[in-house]
Amino acid sequence: MINRERLTHLKQLEAESIHILREVVAEFANPVMMYSVGKDSSVMLHLAMKAFAPSKLPFPLLHVDTKWKFKEMIEFRDQRAKDLGFDLVVYSNPEGEKMNISPFEHGSKVHTDVMKTQGLKQALNAGGYDAVIGGARRDEEKSRAKERIFSFRDKHHRWDPKNQRPELWNIYNTAIQKGESVRVFPISNWTELDVWQYIYLEGIPIPSLYFAKEREVVEYEGTKIMVDDDRMPETLRSTAQKEMVRFRTLGCYPLTGAINSSATTLPEIIKEMLLSTSSEREGRLIDKDQEGAMELKKIEGYF
């Protein structure tokens, strides 16, 4: 029996997360873990490897590919799958691909709904998953702050924030009917600082987009967007300037703002984060496309 009082703060969080991951595997028939390639996903993957070592992961990793992720994210994803040998499922909404949905042409709201939310629901239906593990944290955003660790979803993958199950200590209600599912958030109680310190202490690989570098960026929708490919409209690309920037969060490149930074190492990122007064999701345009944007997206099935 582990004496939690003798564990460091990070080791307590690690132990809680590993307990939750093992609870999912013990209680559900067909779980899956979301893998969006960012820092939180990287921590989740590391925790899962620890939780079930030396065995292979007992569930696949699912990546919903919107076709607009940073090129480096896709390269990093494929390399990690090759290095670690986990089962990677990649899914894209075929209707969205046919319609050639673009964040530039159709806007963040339509793009996110079609390529992310609908794509995710299609992937979950196709896989028949009854538990979906994700790396969302309560300190990220206000709608996530009020969500349970084991978050119930109906047969349409919808979340009702007014009808959540009580969670007492580390006792979780995992009962569901056929067709229903649960979203599980093992690092709910972690902060952004916890994540970065854990990455540093455990030596977890992350995409270099998190580190400051001279990159070509343009001003778009009130934030700095990196020029990642030639699908960016020429009128925007022609205004590109090289700046020393990095990203605090990763997503579709036209919807993910960079910040000016000189942090090129993990200790420098941690120091910069401690001095920051803004949220890490400040640069995510999908959080600003309507009032209460994230909560409305989650109600419809977004992660």
Curated annotation (Swiss-Prot):
Enzyme class: transferase
Keywords attached to this entry: ATP-binding, Nucleotide-binding, Nucleotidyltransferase, Transferase
GO biological process, one term: sulfate assimilation
Enzyme Commission designation: 2.7.7.4
Superkingdom assignment: Bacteria
Catalysed reactions, as listed in the record: sulfate + ATP + H(+) = adenosine 5'-phosphosulfate + diphosphate
Cystine crosslinks: none
Pathway recorded for this protein: Sulfur metabolism; hydrogen sulfide biosynthesis; sulfite from sulfate: step 1/3
GO molecular function: ATP binding; sulfate adenylyltransferase (ATP) activity
Pfam families reported in the protein's UniProt record: PAPS_reduct
Described function: With CysN forms the ATP sulfurylase (ATPS) that catalyzes the adenylation of sulfate producing adenosine 5'-phosphosulfate (APS) and diphosphate, the first enzymatic step in sulfur assimilation pathway. APS synthesis involves the formation of a high-energy phosphoric-sulfuric acid anhydride bond driven by GTP hydrolysis by CysN coupled to ATP hydrolysis by CysD.
Quaternary data: Heterodimer composed of CysD, the smaller subunit, and CysN.
Protein family: Belongs to the PAPS reductase family. CysD subfamily.
Protein name per its UniProtKB record: Sulfate adenylyltransferase subunit 2
Organism, as annotated: Sulfurovum sp. (strain NBC37-1)
Higher taxonomy: Bacteria, Pseudomonadati, Campylobacterota, Epsilonproteobacteria, Campylobacterales
